[in-house]
A protein has these predicted regions:
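Peripheral interaction segments used for macromolecular assembly
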Residues: 1-136
Length: 136
């Protein structure tokens, strides 16, 4: 099954030279630090604003952002794997992603279990989605 068959609606356009990602770990040169609180930072895709960070985790192989995207997608909270972050600008409180808004919007949903997004099958599906889309 191709990524386009697996995720209805096809895959949106993205940055042509996007690097391979490790979805659930912060990129080493992103500017992430466990001492910095990212709550309230703006999340920006390559083509515009996604929303504001409600939660950021820093667990090995399980790091992600929970983004309030209600202004963009009515009633939506999105989970963005930390590996999609290209750089964090602490002075402007912006987190920049390596993909488009449409790629984030079209991602398979990740449902919380006990308030955390740790459901392994859903996380694996989300990781496959981003790896397939970003490796094109």
């Amino acid at each position: 099954m191709t990524p386009n068959e697996q995720y209805s609606g096809g895959l949106p356009p993205l940055v042509p030279s996007a690097p391979a990602i490790d979805p659930w770990n912060w990129p080493p040169d992103s500017g992430w630090s466990p001492q910095r609180n990212l709550i309230g930072y703006h999340v920006k895709a390559t083509d515009g604003n996604v929303g504001k960070i409600d939660m950021a985790t820093h667990a090995q192989d399980a790091s992600y952002l929970v983004v309030d995207a209600r202004r963009w997608i009515f009633g939506s909270t999105l989970v963005v794997p930390a590996g999609l972050v290209s750089v964090i600008d602490h002075s402007e409180q912006n987190v920049y992603l390596i993909c488009t808004k449409e790629l984030v919007k079209s991602a398979p949903p990740l449902k919380p279990v006990d308030g955390k997004f740790t459901n392994r099958p859903d996380r694996d599906k989300l990781a496959r989605y981003y790896r397939a889309a970003l490796s094109r």
